[in-house]
Amino acid sequence: MSVCYRPPGNETLLSWKGSRATGTAFLLLAALLGLPGNGFVVWSLAGWRPTAGRPLAATLVLHLALADGAVLLLTPLFVAFLSRQAWPLGQVGCKAVYYVCALSMYASVLLTGLLSLQRCLAVTRPFLAPRLRSPALARRLLLGVWLAALVLAVPAAVYRHLWGDRVCQLCHPSAVHAAAHLSLETLTAFVLPFGTVLGCYGVTLARLRGARWGSGRQGTRVGRLVSAIVLAFGLLWAPYHAVNLLQAVAALAPPEGPLARLGGAGQAARAGTTALAFFSSSVNPVLYVFTAGDLLPRAGPRFLTRLFEGSGEARVGSRSREGTMELRTTPRLKVVGQGRGYGDPGGGGRMEKDSQEW
């Protein structure tokens, strides 16, 4: 792509020193926290094979850690890019690296949305709990997530270009292409998944507050975890997608108007907002530690598996199975009473009465 649409001002993502410095700091912090954190999650869950089947939530968290860890492995490359102000891998590397970033972004947000939907079903439809442990279901869902992410990430590679052999950034053939691409990315990678997360967690919290086992300490613990996940997701991704929308609006605005000039400012701010989105890949392991911190003294390094063994899905499913057992064993208790009636002539009438009452 030889001719690229550029907003007024000829700004690039390396133009603002403050954005470069902020981006570098966020990338370093993300790598410091996220690489060992996600590595620990993968180590803890990959080899866990409970006899009842791995909970779907644990499988989704495992793949979420894989997606986050993959993009965090690229942080040294981006730190070098921002600090040296030159892209080191050429045109092919420019497209390939940003494709991996987009793939990880879509996989992460889709897995987060699917995880919130799973938690909602585990609370509102407890009879589905055994089915949610099905390995076949997990394989189908994960295949769909990764295939969707592979397809949705394609524009990130198509619209990346190495400018002047030193800046790897977006290159659209026209303003219409820029507006369409950036708007679609925000819709599919933020608006729809974030709306799903908010809706599912809203339903889950409403159900937990009204349920007997949702009150007290456990209800507070679940509520804090839900609030932290939603807050982190929204805060860390919102600036990136705000820049997307700003540039999309600027691309369609009159070239000499104030909105068009804001597109250049958004381009210059992209380094910092992209690095902040990178930081979202390191947050989830920290949230798991805060959620299951009381399990550390008892479970040690395997506290994460203990967390999912005692998750809401397991408890609700257990309660559902216990309720089924009560219904099945009640007639047997009546039969025991009937057996005593054979030795007692008066027992037969009571046996028939009890059976009819049940």
From Swiss-Prot:
GO cellular component: membrane; nucleoplasm; plasma membrane
Gly residues compositional bias, start-end: 338-349
Location of region: Disordered: 315-358
Pfam families: 7tm_1
The protein's name: Leukotriene B4 receptor 2
Annotated transmembrane regions: 25-45, 61-81, 97-117, 141-161, 186-206, 226-246, 276-296
PROSITE patterns in the cross-refs: G_PROTEIN_RECEP_F1_2
InterPro entries, A to Z: GPCR_Rhodpsn, GPCR_Rhodpsn_7TM, Leukotriene_B4_rcpt, Leukotriene_B4_typ-2_rcpt
Family, per entry: Belongs to the G-protein coupled receptor 1 family.
Top-level division of the source organism's lineage: Eukaryota
Keyword Transmembrane helix: yes
Extracellular side: 1-24, 82-96, 162-185, 247-275
